[in-house]
Amino acid sequence: TGDLGASPDNINWVLTSYIVAAAIMTPVTGWLADRFGRKELFLTAVVGFTVFSMLCGIAWSLETMVFFRLMQGVFGAAIVPLSQTFLLDINPRERHGQAMAIWGAGIMLGPILGPTLGGWLTENFNWRWVFFINLPVGIVAFLGMAAYLPAVARRVRGFDFFGFAMISLGVGALQLLLDRGGEVDWFSSVEIWIELGLSLTGFWVFIIHTMTAEHPFIDPKIFLDRNFVTGLAFIFVMGVLILASMSLLPPMLSTIFGYPTVTIGVVMGPRGVGTMISMLVVGRLMSKIDARILVVIGFLLTAQSLYTMSSFTPQMDNWLIISSGVIQGLGMGMVFVPLSTVAFATLDVRFRTDATALFSLVRNLGSSIGVSVVTVLMVRNTQINHTELSAFINPFNPNLWAVSPAAASGDPMALSQVDRIVNLQAMMISYVNDFKILMVMTLLAIPFVFLLRKPKQAPAGGAPAAHMD
Protein backbone atom coordinates (compact mmCIF):
# COMPACT_ATOMS: atom_id res chain seq x y z
CA THR A 1 0.00 0.00 0.00
CA GLY A 2 2.96 2.29 0.46
CA ASP A 3 3.64 2.44 -3.29
CA LEU A 4 0.16 3.85 -3.88
CA GLY A 5 0.00 6.07 -0.82
CA ALA A 6 -3.21 4.36 0.33
CA SER A 7 -4.44 3.18 3.71
CA PRO A 8 -5.54 -0.45 4.21
CA ASP A 9 -9.20 0.69 4.23
CA ASN A 10 -8.84 2.56 0.94
CA ILE A 11 -6.95 -0.27 -0.72
CA ASN A 12 -10.05 -2.47 -0.34
CA TRP A 13 -11.53 -0.52 -3.25
CA VAL A 14 -8.98 -2.26 -5.48
CA LEU A 15 -10.82 -5.53 -4.85
CA THR A 16 -14.31 -4.04 -4.66
CA SER A 17 -14.02 -2.25 -8.02
CA TYR A 18 -13.11 -5.49 -9.80
CA ILE A 19 -15.79 -7.60 -8.14
CA VAL A 20 -18.60 -5.09 -8.74
CA ALA A 21 -17.62 -4.48 -12.38
CA ALA A 22 -17.37 -8.21 -13.12
CA ALA A 23 -20.70 -8.90 -11.41
CA ILE A 24 -22.49 -6.22 -13.44
CA MET A 25 -20.99 -7.26 -16.77
CA THR A 26 -21.41 -11.03 -16.40
CA PRO A 27 -25.17 -11.12 -17.22
CA VAL A 28 -24.67 -9.19 -20.46
CA THR A 29 -22.21 -11.76 -21.83
CA GLY A 30 -24.90 -13.61 -23.79
CA TRP A 31 -26.16 -10.53 -25.61
CA LEU A 32 -22.63 -9.30 -26.39
CA ALA A 33 -21.70 -12.73 -27.77
CA ASP A 34 -24.74 -12.76 -30.05
CA ARG A 35 -24.22 -9.17 -31.17
CA PHE A 36 -20.46 -9.13 -31.80
CA GLY A 37 -19.64 -12.83 -32.18
CA ARG A 38 -18.71 -15.31 -29.50
CA LYS A 39 -15.13 -15.79 -30.65
CA GLU A 40 -14.60 -12.07 -31.19
CA LEU A 41 -15.93 -11.27 -27.71
CA PHE A 42 -13.74 -13.93 -26.12
CA LEU A 43 -10.59 -12.62 -27.81
CA THR A 44 -11.47 -9.04 -26.87
CA ALA A 45 -12.07 -10.09 -23.27
CA VAL A 46 -8.68 -11.81 -23.02
CA VAL A 47 -6.85 -8.85 -24.59
CA GLY A 48 -8.63 -6.32 -22.39
CA PHE A 49 -8.09 -8.35 -19.23
CA THR A 50 -4.39 -8.79 -19.99
CA VAL A 51 -3.79 -5.14 -20.93
CA PHE A 52 -5.50 -3.78 -17.84
CA SER A 53 -3.71 -6.34 -15.70
CA MET A 54 -0.43 -4.89 -16.95
CA LEU A 55 -1.69 -1.38 -16.27
CA CYS A 56 -2.56 -2.44 -12.71
CA GLY A 57 1.05 -3.51 -12.33
CA ILE A 58 2.31 -0.05 -13.27
CA ALA A 59 -0.43 1.92 -11.48
CA TRP A 60 0.99 5.10 -9.92
CA SER A 61 -1.85 6.01 -7.56
CA LEU A 62 -4.83 4.48 -5.82
CA GLU A 63 -7.22 6.19 -8.24
CA THR A 64 -5.51 4.72 -11.31
CA MET A 65 -5.31 1.29 -9.70
CA VAL A 66 -9.03 1.29 -8.88
CA PHE A 67 -9.89 2.36 -12.44
CA PHE A 68 -7.63 -0.26 -14.02
CA ARG A 69 -9.08 -2.96 -11.76
CA LEU A 70 -12.60 -1.86 -12.65
CA MET A 71 -11.80 -2.19 -16.35
CA GLN A 72 -10.13 -5.53 -15.72
CA GLY A 73 -13.41 -6.69 -14.21
CA VAL A 74 -15.38 -5.35 -17.20
CA PHE A 75 -13.30 -7.39 -19.65
CA GLY A 76 -12.76 -10.40 -17.40
CA ALA A 77 -16.46 -10.98 -16.74
CA ALA A 78 -17.03 -12.81 -20.03
CA ILE A 79 -14.03 -15.16 -19.84
CA VAL A 80 -15.47 -17.86 -17.55
CA PRO A 81 -18.96 -18.20 -19.08
CA LEU A 82 -17.65 -18.10 -22.66
CA SER A 83 -15.00 -20.71 -21.93
CA GLN A 84 -17.69 -23.02 -20.57
CA THR A 85 -19.97 -22.34 -23.53
CA PHE A 86 -17.25 -23.14 -26.08
CA LEU A 87 -16.32 -26.40 -24.37
CA LEU A 88 -19.96 -27.51 -24.27
CA ASP A 89 -20.45 -26.55 -27.92
CA ILE A 90 -17.35 -28.13 -29.46
CA ASN A 91 -17.70 -31.45 -27.62
CA PRO A 92 -20.43 -34.05 -28.24
CA ARG A 93 -22.78 -34.68 -25.33
CA GLU A 94 -21.08 -37.92 -24.31
CA ARG A 95 -17.80 -36.02 -23.74
CA HIS A 96 -19.26 -33.12 -21.77
CA GLY A 97 -18.14 -34.71 -18.51
CA GLN A 98 -14.48 -34.80 -19.57
CA ALA A 99 -14.73 -31.29 -21.01
CA MET A 100 -16.19 -29.92 -17.78
CA ALA A 101 -13.46 -31.72 -15.82
CA ILE A 102 -10.79 -29.81 -17.72
CA TRP A 103 -12.72 -26.54 -17.45
CA GLY A 104 -13.52 -27.10 -13.79
CA ALA A 105 -9.87 -27.74 -12.95
CA GLY A 106 -9.04 -24.21 -14.06
CA ILE A 107 -12.04 -22.67 -12.30
CA MET A 108 -11.41 -24.47 -9.01
CA LEU A 109 -7.62 -24.34 -8.93
CA GLY A 110 -7.50 -20.58 -9.51
CA PRO A 111 -8.93 -19.60 -6.10
CA ILE A 112 -6.94 -22.39 -4.40
CA LEU A 113 -3.48 -21.78 -5.86
CA GLY A 114 -3.83 -18.07 -6.69
CA PRO A 115 -3.34 -16.76 -3.13
CA THR A 116 -0.34 -19.06 -2.67
CA LEU A 117 1.34 -17.87 -5.85
CA GLY A 118 0.41 -14.26 -5.11
CA GLY A 119 1.88 -14.48 -1.62
CA TRP A 120 5.11 -15.99 -2.94
CA LEU A 121 5.48 -13.33 -5.64
CA THR A 122 4.80 -10.55 -3.15
CA GLU A 123 7.30 -11.87 -0.61
CA ASN A 124 10.08 -12.64 -3.10
CA PHE A 125 9.58 -9.91 -5.71
CA ASN A 126 6.90 -7.23 -5.49
CA TRP A 127 3.10 -7.05 -5.39
CA ARG A 128 3.15 -5.67 -8.93
CA TRP A 129 4.29 -9.06 -10.23
CA VAL A 130 0.89 -10.45 -9.22
CA PHE A 131 -0.42 -8.52 -12.24
CA PHE A 132 2.62 -8.79 -14.53
CA ILE A 133 2.47 -12.59 -14.45
CA ASN A 134 -0.80 -12.45 -16.41
CA LEU A 135 0.97 -11.12 -19.52
CA PRO A 136 2.56 -14.36 -20.83
CA VAL A 137 -0.56 -16.32 -19.90
CA GLY A 138 -2.76 -13.83 -21.74
CA ILE A 139 -0.58 -13.88 -24.86
CA VAL A 140 -0.54 -17.68 -25.05
CA ALA A 141 -4.29 -17.84 -24.45
CA PHE A 142 -5.00 -15.27 -27.17
CA LEU A 143 -2.82 -17.00 -29.77
CA GLY A 144 -4.31 -20.41 -28.99
CA MET A 145 -7.91 -19.20 -29.15
CA ALA A 146 -7.33 -17.15 -32.29
CA ALA A 147 -5.94 -20.22 -34.02
CA TYR A 148 -8.32 -22.94 -32.84
CA LEU A 149 -11.63 -21.50 -31.64
CA PRO A 150 -14.40 -21.94 -34.22
CA ALA A 151 -16.32 -18.92 -35.42
CA VAL A 152 -19.96 -18.88 -34.31
CA ALA A 153 -22.76 -17.28 -36.30
CA ARG A 154 -24.04 -14.01 -34.85
CA ARG A 155 -27.64 -13.64 -33.81
CA VAL A 156 -29.38 -10.29 -33.90
CA ARG A 157 -31.62 -9.53 -30.94
CA GLY A 158 -32.74 -6.37 -29.26
CA PHE A 159 -31.12 -5.08 -26.11
CA ASP A 160 -33.31 -4.62 -23.07
CA PHE A 161 -31.70 -1.53 -21.52
CA PHE A 162 -34.17 -1.33 -18.66
CA GLY A 163 -33.75 -4.99 -17.73
CA PHE A 164 -29.97 -4.66 -17.85
CA ALA A 165 -30.11 -1.52 -15.70
CA MET A 166 -32.24 -3.25 -13.07
CA ILE A 167 -30.13 -6.41 -12.80
CA SER A 168 -27.01 -4.24 -12.73
CA LEU A 169 -28.50 -2.22 -9.88
CA GLY A 170 -29.42 -5.36 -7.96
CA VAL A 171 -26.11 -7.15 -8.46
CA GLY A 172 -23.91 -4.07 -8.10
CA ALA A 173 -25.57 -2.85 -4.89
CA LEU A 174 -25.46 -6.36 -3.41
CA GLN A 175 -21.74 -6.71 -4.12
CA LEU A 176 -21.06 -3.29 -2.62
CA LEU A 177 -23.05 -4.29 0.47
CA LEU A 178 -21.07 -7.51 0.86
CA ASP A 179 -17.68 -5.91 0.26
CA ARG A 180 -18.25 -2.80 2.35
CA GLY A 181 -20.25 -4.33 5.20
CA GLY A 182 -17.29 -5.38 7.30
CA GLU A 183 -15.67 -1.96 7.06
CA VAL A 184 -18.72 0.06 8.13
CA ASP A 185 -20.12 -2.38 10.74
CA TRP A 186 -22.90 -3.71 8.55
CA PHE A 187 -26.44 -2.62 9.40
CA SER A 188 -25.36 -0.01 11.90
CA SER A 189 -24.37 1.99 8.80
CA VAL A 190 -26.82 3.99 6.69
CA GLU A 191 -24.75 3.08 3.62
CA ILE A 192 -25.53 -0.62 4.02
CA TRP A 193 -29.27 0.02 4.39
CA ILE A 194 -29.23 2.13 1.22
CA GLU A 195 -27.36 -0.57 -0.70
CA LEU A 196 -29.76 -3.24 0.59
CA GLY A 197 -32.76 -1.17 -0.52
CA LEU A 198 -31.26 -0.54 -3.96
CA SER A 199 -30.39 -4.23 -4.39
CA LEU A 200 -33.84 -5.48 -3.41
CA THR A 201 -35.50 -2.88 -5.62
CA GLY A 202 -33.31 -3.77 -8.59
CA PHE A 203 -33.92 -7.51 -8.30
CA TRP A 204 -37.67 -7.12 -7.68
CA VAL A 205 -38.23 -4.80 -10.62
CA PHE A 206 -36.03 -7.02 -12.82
CA ILE A 207 -38.11 -10.11 -11.98
CA ILE A 208 -41.41 -8.34 -12.69
CA HIS A 209 -40.01 -6.84 -15.89
CA THR A 210 -38.67 -10.22 -17.07
CA MET A 211 -42.09 -11.85 -16.62
CA THR A 212 -44.00 -9.08 -18.40
CA ALA A 213 -41.70 -7.62 -21.08
CA GLU A 214 -42.04 -8.70 -24.70
CA HIS A 215 -38.27 -9.05 -25.17
CA PRO A 216 -36.70 -9.26 -21.69
CA PHE A 217 -32.98 -9.08 -20.98
CA ILE A 218 -32.95 -12.76 -19.99
CA ASP A 219 -35.45 -15.12 -21.62
CA PRO A 220 -37.59 -16.56 -18.79
CA LYS A 221 -37.82 -19.86 -20.70
CA ILE A 222 -34.34 -20.61 -19.34
CA PHE A 223 -35.89 -21.07 -15.91
CA LEU A 224 -38.34 -23.70 -17.17
CA ASP A 225 -35.50 -26.22 -17.35
CA ARG A 226 -35.54 -28.11 -14.05
CA ASN A 227 -31.93 -29.26 -14.24
CA PHE A 228 -30.64 -25.77 -14.89
CA VAL A 229 -32.61 -24.16 -12.05
CA THR A 230 -31.55 -26.92 -9.64
CA GLY A 231 -27.99 -26.51 -10.89
CA LEU A 232 -28.12 -22.79 -10.11
CA ALA A 233 -29.15 -23.56 -6.54
CA PHE A 234 -26.33 -26.05 -6.11
CA ILE A 235 -23.67 -23.86 -7.71
CA PHE A 236 -24.68 -21.15 -5.24
CA VAL A 237 -24.07 -23.63 -2.41
CA MET A 238 -20.75 -24.60 -3.98
CA GLY A 239 -19.78 -20.94 -4.22
CA VAL A 240 -20.44 -20.58 -0.51
CA LEU A 241 -18.54 -23.75 0.44
CA ILE A 242 -15.48 -23.20 -1.73
CA LEU A 243 -14.52 -19.67 -0.80
CA ALA A 244 -16.06 -19.52 2.67
CA SER A 245 -13.92 -22.35 4.00
CA MET A 246 -10.86 -21.10 2.11
CA SER A 247 -11.30 -17.56 3.45
CA LEU A 248 -11.28 -18.86 7.03
CA LEU A 249 -8.09 -20.92 6.85
CA PRO A 250 -5.38 -18.31 6.04
CA PRO A 251 -6.25 -15.88 8.88
CA MET A 252 -6.70 -18.81 11.28
CA LEU A 253 -3.33 -20.30 10.39
CA SER A 254 -1.65 -16.91 10.56
CA THR A 255 -3.21 -15.56 13.75
CA ILE A 256 -3.62 -18.66 15.91
CA PHE A 257 -0.89 -20.95 14.58
CA GLY A 258 1.60 -18.23 13.67
CA TYR A 259 2.28 -19.63 10.20
CA PRO A 260 4.11 -17.35 7.74
CA THR A 261 2.57 -16.76 4.31
CA VAL A 262 4.75 -19.33 2.54
CA THR A 263 3.88 -22.07 5.05
CA ILE A 264 0.17 -21.30 4.69
CA GLY A 265 0.53 -21.77 0.95
CA VAL A 266 2.35 -25.07 1.43
CA VAL A 267 -0.26 -26.61 3.75
CA MET A 268 -3.19 -25.37 1.62
CA GLY A 269 -1.67 -26.24 -1.76
CA PRO A 270 -2.42 -30.01 -1.62
CA ARG A 271 -6.12 -29.13 -1.66
CA GLY A 272 -5.60 -28.20 -5.30
CA VAL A 273 -3.96 -31.56 -5.99
CA GLY A 274 -7.02 -33.31 -4.56
CA THR A 275 -9.29 -31.20 -6.74
CA MET A 276 -7.27 -31.92 -9.88
CA ILE A 277 -7.20 -35.68 -9.29
CA SER A 278 -10.91 -35.77 -8.50
CA MET A 279 -11.93 -33.83 -11.59
CA LEU A 280 -9.84 -35.91 -13.97
CA VAL A 281 -11.21 -39.16 -12.53
CA VAL A 282 -14.83 -37.98 -12.32
CA GLY A 283 -14.75 -36.74 -15.91
CA ARG A 284 -14.26 -40.35 -17.02
CA LEU A 285 -16.60 -41.89 -14.45
CA MET A 286 -19.58 -39.84 -15.61
CA SER A 287 -20.15 -42.13 -18.59
CA LYS A 288 -20.42 -45.12 -16.22
CA ILE A 289 -21.96 -43.79 -12.97
CA ASP A 290 -25.07 -41.66 -12.44
CA ALA A 291 -23.88 -38.06 -12.04
CA ARG A 292 -26.20 -37.60 -9.06
CA ILE A 293 -24.44 -40.39 -7.16
CA LEU A 294 -21.10 -38.70 -7.82
CA VAL A 295 -22.48 -35.40 -6.50
CA VAL A 296 -23.73 -37.11 -3.32
CA ILE A 297 -20.33 -38.75 -2.75
CA GLY A 298 -18.67 -35.39 -3.34
CA PHE A 299 -20.87 -33.66 -0.78
CA LEU A 300 -20.20 -36.44 1.76
CA LEU A 301 -16.44 -36.05 1.30
CA THR A 302 -16.78 -32.29 1.66
CA ALA A 303 -18.83 -32.73 4.84
CA GLN A 304 -16.21 -35.15 6.20
CA SER A 305 -13.45 -32.61 5.60
CA LEU A 306 -15.44 -29.86 7.32
CA TYR A 307 -16.11 -32.21 10.25
CA THR A 308 -12.35 -32.70 10.56
CA MET A 309 -11.82 -28.93 10.41
CA SER A 310 -14.35 -28.50 13.19
CA SER A 311 -12.01 -30.52 15.42
CA PHE A 312 -8.97 -28.29 14.76
CA THR A 313 -6.99 -27.26 17.85
CA PRO A 314 -3.94 -25.01 18.25
CA GLN A 315 -1.92 -28.10 19.26
CA MET A 316 -2.50 -30.13 16.06
CA ASP A 317 0.18 -30.73 13.42
CA ASN A 318 0.27 -29.80 9.74
CA TRP A 319 -0.87 -33.20 8.50
CA LEU A 320 -4.42 -32.77 9.74
CA ILE A 321 -4.70 -29.47 7.86
CA ILE A 322 -3.25 -31.01 4.71
CA SER A 323 -5.33 -34.21 4.82
CA SER A 324 -8.60 -32.36 5.43
CA GLY A 325 -7.77 -30.03 2.55
CA VAL A 326 -7.07 -32.92 0.18
CA ILE A 327 -10.36 -34.61 1.13
CA GLN A 328 -12.23 -31.35 0.61
CA GLY A 329 -10.56 -30.91 -2.77
CA LEU A 330 -11.59 -34.44 -3.78
CA GLY A 331 -15.16 -33.79 -2.67
CA MET A 332 -15.59 -30.45 -4.37
CA GLY A 333 -14.17 -31.80 -7.60
CA MET A 334 -16.69 -34.65 -7.49
CA VAL A 335 -19.51 -32.13 -7.09
CA PHE A 336 -18.38 -29.44 -9.50
CA VAL A 337 -17.83 -31.51 -12.64
CA PRO A 338 -21.12 -33.49 -12.68
CA LEU A 339 -23.06 -30.40 -11.63
CA SER A 340 -21.54 -28.27 -14.40
CA THR A 341 -22.46 -30.98 -16.89
CA VAL A 342 -25.96 -32.02 -15.79
CA ALA A 343 -27.13 -28.41 -15.32
CA PHE A 344 -26.80 -27.84 -19.08
CA ALA A 345 -27.59 -31.35 -20.32
CA THR A 346 -31.28 -30.70 -21.01
CA LEU A 347 -31.14 -26.96 -21.75
CA ASP A 348 -31.92 -25.69 -25.24
CA VAL A 349 -28.61 -24.77 -26.90
CA ARG A 350 -30.06 -21.35 -27.85
CA PHE A 351 -29.88 -20.35 -24.20
CA ARG A 352 -26.43 -21.77 -23.49
CA THR A 353 -24.42 -18.53 -23.47
CA ASP A 354 -26.93 -16.69 -21.30
CA ALA A 355 -27.15 -19.74 -19.05
CA THR A 356 -23.39 -20.05 -18.52
CA ALA A 357 -23.28 -16.34 -17.66
CA LEU A 358 -26.01 -16.83 -15.04
CA PHE A 359 -24.21 -19.93 -13.76
CA SER A 360 -21.02 -17.93 -13.27
CA LEU A 361 -22.85 -14.99 -11.70
CA VAL A 362 -24.70 -17.13 -9.15
CA ARG A 363 -21.49 -18.97 -8.22
CA ASN A 364 -19.70 -15.66 -7.63
CA LEU A 365 -22.60 -14.27 -5.60
CA GLY A 366 -22.57 -17.43 -3.49
CA SER A 367 -18.85 -16.96 -2.89
CA SER A 368 -19.28 -13.32 -1.87
CA ILE A 369 -22.22 -14.05 0.43
CA GLY A 370 -20.48 -17.06 1.97
CA VAL A 371 -17.28 -15.17 2.73
CA SER A 372 -19.20 -12.24 4.23
CA VAL A 373 -21.42 -14.44 6.41
CA VAL A 374 -18.66 -16.62 7.87
CA THR A 375 -16.47 -13.57 8.47
CA VAL A 376 -19.24 -11.76 10.33
CA LEU A 377 -20.01 -14.86 12.38
CA MET A 378 -16.34 -15.32 13.22
CA VAL A 379 -15.89 -11.71 14.38
CA ARG A 380 -19.14 -11.53 16.36
CA ASN A 381 -18.73 -14.96 17.95
CA THR A 382 -15.15 -14.17 18.91
CA GLN A 383 -16.43 -11.21 20.92
CA ILE A 384 -19.10 -13.36 22.60
CA ASN A 385 -16.69 -16.21 23.30
CA HIS A 386 -14.12 -13.79 24.71
CA THR A 387 -16.70 -12.38 27.12
CA GLU A 388 -17.78 -15.84 28.26
CA LEU A 389 -14.23 -17.14 28.72
CA SER A 390 -13.12 -13.98 30.50
CA ALA A 391 -15.69 -14.66 33.19
CA PHE A 392 -13.43 -17.48 34.41
CA ILE A 393 -10.50 -15.10 34.89
CA ASN A 394 -11.09 -14.13 38.50
CA PRO A 395 -9.36 -14.70 41.85
CA PHE A 396 -12.09 -17.13 42.93
CA ASN A 397 -11.23 -19.64 40.19
CA PRO A 398 -8.90 -22.32 41.66
CA ASN A 399 -7.85 -23.41 38.16
CA LEU A 400 -6.47 -19.93 37.47
CA TRP A 401 -4.40 -20.10 40.67
CA ALA A 402 -3.02 -23.45 39.50
CA VAL A 403 -2.10 -22.17 36.03
CA SER A 404 -1.04 -18.57 36.76
CA PRO A 405 -0.90 -17.43 40.37
CA ALA A 406 0.34 -14.03 39.21
CA ALA A 407 -2.75 -13.48 37.06
CA ALA A 408 -5.02 -14.70 39.84
CA SER A 409 -3.45 -12.19 42.20
CA GLY A 410 -4.07 -9.37 39.70
CA ASP A 411 -0.60 -8.82 38.19
CA PRO A 412 -1.18 -6.60 35.08
CA MET A 413 1.49 -8.27 32.92
CA ALA A 414 0.25 -11.76 33.76
CA LEU A 415 -3.36 -10.74 33.11
CA SER A 416 -2.32 -9.36 29.72
CA GLN A 417 -0.75 -12.70 28.80
CA VAL A 418 -3.82 -14.59 29.97
CA ASP A 419 -6.08 -12.26 27.97
CA ARG A 420 -4.07 -12.99 24.84
CA ILE A 421 -4.57 -16.73 25.40
CA VAL A 422 -8.28 -16.19 26.02
CA ASN A 423 -8.59 -14.19 22.80
CA LEU A 424 -6.88 -16.92 20.77
CA GLN A 425 -9.15 -19.54 22.32
CA ALA A 426 -12.21 -17.40 21.57
CA MET A 427 -11.11 -17.09 17.93
CA MET A 428 -10.43 -20.82 17.65
CA ILE A 429 -13.92 -21.63 18.94
CA SER A 430 -15.41 -19.21 16.39
CA TYR A 431 -13.50 -20.76 13.49
CA VAL A 432 -14.56 -24.25 14.58
CA ASN A 433 -18.21 -23.16 14.81
CA ASP A 434 -18.02 -21.71 11.28
CA PHE A 435 -16.73 -25.04 9.96
CA LYS A 436 -19.60 -26.82 11.74
CA ILE A 437 -22.14 -24.50 10.08
CA LEU A 438 -20.64 -25.19 6.65
CA MET A 439 -20.71 -28.94 7.38
CA VAL A 440 -24.41 -28.83 8.27
CA MET A 441 -25.13 -26.77 5.14
CA THR A 442 -23.36 -29.42 3.04
CA LEU A 443 -25.33 -32.29 4.57
CA LEU A 444 -28.65 -30.46 4.15
CA ALA A 445 -27.96 -30.05 0.42
CA ILE A 446 -27.62 -33.79 -0.23
CA PRO A 447 -31.33 -34.81 -0.39
CA PHE A 448 -32.01 -32.14 -3.01
CA VAL A 449 -29.47 -33.67 -5.41
CA PHE A 450 -32.17 -36.02 -6.67
CA LEU A 451 -34.17 -33.08 -7.98
CA LEU A 452 -31.72 -33.29 -10.88
CA ARG A 453 -32.97 -35.47 -13.70
CA LYS A 454 -30.74 -37.85 -15.54
CA PRO A 455 -30.74 -36.84 -19.24
CA LYS A 456 -31.53 -39.41 -21.88
CA GLN A 457 -28.74 -40.88 -23.93
CA ALA A 458 -27.40 -38.39 -26.46
CA PRO A 459 -28.54 -39.11 -30.02
CA ALA A 460 -26.08 -40.10 -32.69
CA GLY A 461 -23.62 -37.38 -33.50
CA GLY A 462 -23.61 -36.06 -29.97
CA ALA A 463 -26.39 -33.54 -30.39
CA PRO A 464 -27.74 -32.24 -27.13
CA ALA A 465 -30.76 -34.08 -25.87
CA ALA A 466 -33.82 -31.96 -25.35
CA HIS A 467 -35.84 -34.45 -23.34
CA MET A 468 -35.48 -35.93 -19.90
CA ASP A 469 -36.46 -39.17 -18.24
Q: Would you name each region that the model predicts?
A:
Residues 123-241, 248, 255, 260-262, ...:
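Hydrophobic transmembrane-helix bundles of small-molecule transporters
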Residues 44-48, 52, 68, 75, ...:
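Residue-level signature of the transmembrane alpha-helical cores
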Residues 8-15, 175-176, 188-198, 202-384:
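12-transmembrane solute porter fold
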Residues 140, 359-454, 459-469:
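Hydrophobic transmembrane architecture of multi-pass small-molecule transporters
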